[in-house]
Amino acid sequence: SHRNILATLFSWALVTTLKREVDNADANQAKDSQTASEPQNQSAILHCVPLFHVTGSHSGFLMSIIAGRKMVMMPKWDPGLALQLIQDEKIGAITGVPTQTWDLLTHPDRDKYDLSTFKELSGGGAPRPPEHVKKLKDGFKDSEPSIGYGLTETNAAGTLNLGKDYLNHPGSCGRAIPPVTDVGIIDENWNFLSEPKVVGEIVIKSPANMVGYWKNEEATKEVFNDDGWFKSGDLGYIDDGFVYIVDRVKDMVIRGGENISCIEVETAIYSHASVQEAAVFGIPEERLGETLCVAICVKPSMELSEQELRDFLQDKLAAFKIPSLMQIAYEELPRVASGKFSKTQLRDIFVSNGKN
């Protein structure tokens, strides 16, 4: 019989909540997964993201329960402590945002620890710079980096990229997760775009999709069509089955009528050897509408000037995509609880400093 049960209420940004239906198909999938899993063969996982995000709750916590694997939880991200835990607890996997695995790879004390058990380098919640993929693979012996894409509204279901596919397509968040998740691209009128590499909004159809926003029918209708497809709010395209994210619809910077993808600019900046962290965003500007900004954390013992970075980016980006305002320092960038960079806080800093 069909069961219509309120399973979870997730709240984010302090103002929005959602609920999700669970029917027999969900329960059966969980049961099948549990039956197929042998706890003694499951490596321990380092859990370093909050449980109030689906990456932490679903990909980390619930899947660990289903698989019967040991889960080591960190109350706050600390790469030095994480390295110690990986050694002491024989951690085999990590689930978190991509910056966390990068923190481990570039930590000055990494070689002091026995990390031989550390193999599964999962990431989600934010893009991983393509050039980091091979560096992670080479830096952790016999490891397998992976990246996933999903949203709170899809209960983390979406795409997955791992193994040779990830090495060959490091800029992609992967293919749709089989067998029940479908991913498509639409235009602003809900027309599906079948041509490869045509940019539109990413939509996801899956039994894992939420029922809707709690007590907000209008907002729910805005993101679903009659066939159950959910509008992600992310711009992207599909090429040979692989999904590529261009940017959040709301995070595109529009400068003098030109659309600028923050992810594209960040990817170019991350290719500079001195850059540890980078966040690109826009702030209001009277004449052009928005000014493109970047905040950068430089690697320890490395140096980087604004002019050096501008010169470096000249043959990688169109002139209008090179940030006009730069903040280059050795301090880590501010983050929200999920581990992502807080671009809202960075915008406020730039505006309050009179950088516009």
Residue ranges and their predicted role:
Residues 109, 117, 142, 179, ...:
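Glycine-centered tight turns that cap/initiate beta-strands
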Residues 66-67, 83, 88-96, 105-168, ...:
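Gly/Ser/Thr-rich phosphate-binding loop
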Residues 175-180, 191-223, 258-260:
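Conserved ATP/PPi-binding loop(s) of AMP-dependent carboxylate-activating enzymes
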Residues 348-356:
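Acidic/polar alpha-helix N-cap and adjacent early helical turns
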Residues 6-47, 52-93, 107:
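Conserved AMP-binding/adenylation subdomain of ANL enzymes
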Residues 94, 183, 206, 211-212, ...:
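AMP-binding/adenylate-forming catalytic core of the ANL superfamily
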